[in-house]
Amino acid sequence: TIDDLARVYVKKCSALTILSYSFKKMYESSIVTYLQQFLTMTKEESIQTILKYYKTWDNFSLSIMYLNIIKTIFFKEKKENVFLLNFTGLLIRNINANPEKRLSIKKTKETYKTLFLKLNLKNKDFGDFLNKFEKNKIDIIKENKTQDNTLQKLQSSFARL
């Protein structure tokens, strides 16, 4: 069912582990709400609806990837990093189940730039992010491979339904 699909996706998507239980429940619900529209559509209508939002797919994928990187590098830390908090908020916006609510690539770039200007971002916060990214490259690659394997298994199991 759609409920099962949403529940399993949220549970297995390691990028979401850094988010609160209440956020994950809300995200799961938004997936169900969005996918319900396809129940009354023909296969062709569903494909057309999905393809209408192809320009948001890369942004969605990159946002999941960066959330995974953040999880791998910073999950155990309790230190507040202004850049990280705001960047995570931007990424969350771009993984919205409803593609109409995701930012365009252009708007994402603009929003990203304002993280440096509007927030008066400290160079130390961004530098800390880059240093940890460099130090944890191997863990990041391993985590991405694990996530790919998990998603392939999910895809196979749901394809059989």
List each model region and its residues.
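Helical subdomain adjoining the active site within ATP-dependent kinase catalytic cores
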Residues: T1-L161
